[in-house]
């Protein structure tokens, strides 16, 4: 029964989340970090925007983007209404309601799934424990509205954390989201994962959450090569994205529904793509993957 499988998987995710807190991977406050007041304010905006989403879905208007944007600044695969959402990723309005939309989609489990990157990242960075914490650099690629950055800062209070994204609007939302965090300011950079603005061997950790299913196959490979380039030897990559058919066959109907009901043109290819193999081909070692509810997490060492 699909509903039983879903509930069981969600329960296992919550148990994993609590266990990682008990192992001091991150502080307890992250477990109760949902911005309920902001969600309450944004909820009417989400509902009022739904007719626009339905209209785009019905008429397959997948390139309904703000006329003010300079399309030359973005790759073609990015210039679309992913999820049929208003303005794609290219407006302040889209950025302001995105987190709530994701939490509705995942039944409040989005942050728990994001936190699954923290344990492998923390374990991978232990090899640099003889260095000052402030000298360790962690880059979060496709940082979006900054939810992952907040999780990273909770687990890594003294390390240098950088968030990179293509969208000015989402970087602005990320800046708002992380403005009250303790510790050094997190640096935000506009940039493309295909051409990271960092020198070779300059980072110790790279995280990337929910990007790969929105990339064409050839671009996924290109981005993995960039991750490998910027990491120093011994550095760790932790990637989190949608589950795949190979390890979550009981959720195939959910994956198919996601592909059909949301505008996700690269998702059908993604759920069949052998990311583990691609990581090895790029040069990564110790590739490991595990699924948690609707999210699959990979870790790999340069």
What are these regions, as identified by a protein language model?
Residues 97, 108-132:
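Conserved alpha-helix/loop element of class I SAM-dependent methyltransferases that forms part
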Residues 194-206:
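A short acidic, Gly/Pro-enriched loop at the edge of an enzyme's catalytic core
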Residues 205-218:
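A short SAM/SAH-binding and catalytic strip from SAM-dependent methyltransferases
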């Amino acid at each position: 029964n699909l509903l039983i499988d879903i509930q069981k998987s969600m329960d296992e995710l919550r148990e994993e989340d609590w266990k990682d807190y008990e192992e001091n991977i991150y502080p307890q406050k992250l477990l109760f970090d949902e911005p309920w007041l902001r969600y309450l304010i944004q909820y009417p905006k989400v509902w009022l925007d739904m007719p626009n989403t339905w209209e785009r879905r019905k008429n397959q208007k997948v390139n309904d983007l703000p006329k003010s944007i300079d399309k030359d600044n973005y790759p073609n695969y990015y210039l679309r209404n992913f999820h049929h959402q208003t303005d794609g990723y290219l407006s302040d309005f889209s950025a302001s309601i995105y987190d709530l939309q994701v939490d509705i989609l995942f039944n409040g489990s989005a942050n728990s799934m994001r936190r699954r990157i923290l344990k492998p990242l923390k374990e991978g960075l232990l090899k640099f424990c003889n260095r000052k914490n402030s000298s360790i650099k962690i880059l979060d690629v496709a940082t979006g509205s900054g939810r992952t950055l907040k999780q990273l800062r909770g687990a890594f209070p003294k390390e240098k954390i950088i968030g990179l994204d293509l969208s000015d609007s989402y970087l602005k939302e990320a800046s708002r989201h992380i403005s009250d965090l303790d510790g050094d300011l997190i640096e935000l950079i506009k940039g493309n994962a295909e051409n990271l603005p960092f020198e070779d061997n300059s980072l110790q950790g790279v995280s990337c959450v929910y990007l790969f299913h929105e990339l064409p196959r050839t671009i996924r490979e290109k981005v993995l090569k960039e991750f490998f380039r910027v990491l120093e030897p011994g550095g760790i990559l932790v990637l989190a994205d949608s589950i795949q058919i190979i390890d979550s066959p009981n959720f195939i109907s959910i994956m198919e529904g996601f592909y059909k009901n949301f505008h996700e043109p690269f998702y059908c290819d993604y759920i069949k793509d052998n990311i583990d193999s691609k990581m090895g081909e790029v040069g990564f070692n110790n590739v490991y993957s595990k699924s948690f509810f609707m999210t699959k997490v990979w870790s790999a060492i340069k």
